Amino acid sequence: MLGRPTPGLRSGASRVRGVVACAACVLALTGCAGEGFGVGEDARKGGSLTLALDRPPGSLDPALATGPQARLVAWQAYIAPLTLRRASGQEGTEVVPGLARRLPAISDGGLTWRLELRPGLRYSDGSPLRASDLVHSLRRVRALDSPGKRLFAGVDSVEADDRRGRVTYRLRARDGAFAQVLASTYAAPVPARVPLSDQGGRPPPGIGPYRLARVGGQLVLVRRRGFRLPEVPGANVDRIAVSVEPDPERRARRTIAGDLDATVGSLPAQRLPDVRSRYAERYDESAGLSTTMFALSSRSDPVDDVRVRQAVNFAVDSEAFGRVLDGRLAPGCTVLPPKVSGYREPDPCPYGDPAEPGDLRQAATLLREADAEGARVTVGGGPGALDRAVVRSFATLLRKLGLRARVVRPGVPAQATLLHLRPVVPDPRAYLRALRGLDPQLARAARRVRADPDPERAAEDWATLDADLVERARVVPLGYDEDSTLLSARIDSANCFRAHPVFGADLSSICLE
């Protein structure tokens, strides 16, 4: 039947070229999952499933969608001009064309970025994509004071040519990570008629494998049949009904029983050994972008002495803290997680293997040399129950070393502060920005590296900054938070699950048996 072009596809001769490109993309993606269970060509299409999140996603307006739950859902409905490759592991942080024909043309010493959009693209409501919609979307991010506003702070101006389908961004300074910004859901377009107000209650039309709908007050992802872009494969399941179940035991029990088809979020620590052994074929744990650590302020005694900071690093048992965090921590000894540019695995870690118990004897020796036994140290963190438990455990460890540790209220400055770093884009500077108070020169060095147009050289410089923070014991890395997904027996886990390092479970990859 003739009608308007199929969403996500080109028309005429361009459509033929697009289909060839899509076929190549599917072949390239088959079997390349580093985490997850793989995505095969024989994935079954159709059917419906139920998904439980561990907490409400908040606003699903792409200008505002920020938390892990919101971005997991929004990524399926709002593709940006660029996007991250639909793959697991390090490959999933690679920027590829999304709504744009190709990667940006960069000129003027890195200050001008020009994109050309694919022709014939339409939103989920059938309206055509226009270049000026991207200008409107950036205006919304700024007008709504979105958490994504900071990502676009370096944009001086943006111009659109609807006739040619071109968008030009002009930056105030070179930014080697701007491609990551253009691949975030904050950069995804919505029609120019969408108001400059939060539309999360009724998510606006977008372009992606799914469209978001509200059915009887419940969030539902509805597959866009025929959708496909060269770097964004179409979805498998027709309909995904999303609910919120904060009780981890109930989520696990209902998924194992088949009352739920998938659950995203932590499971009870006491249930993990059983799940990992009995349901290994449908349970996935993947380290994402989040790093957990204690930042050590060196502005006051005794933490201003590097020997005290080193002593604390030697004493830490990352596995023990992982148990406090419900078993969702992969031990590590860097600020940058493994899937972010600039990560280099230390060999060996400067303060011992993070998967082994801490070296309390070496820690005690350093404290004696620093004459710090009995010194007062304050410890702080966030208000959440898990944060409070980690802070208390850390204070107990310091007391065991002979320090007089005191836990302060959330928000009160402390000499040792628990941090969970999870930027919305895999940009090394975002991690180091959170630590700029530890070293006045860190922010300047990070700006210099981010402006470097050579990505390989920049990655080496990020690694150097990371290693310097760790070796000087400015931080106490505990490890990398893991995202977990449990699937029911209805899901074809052998062929149909991909864990993305930035967005978590890729819902478009899931299919039924």
Spans of model-derived segments:
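Structural transition elements
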Residues: G327-E369, L386-A389
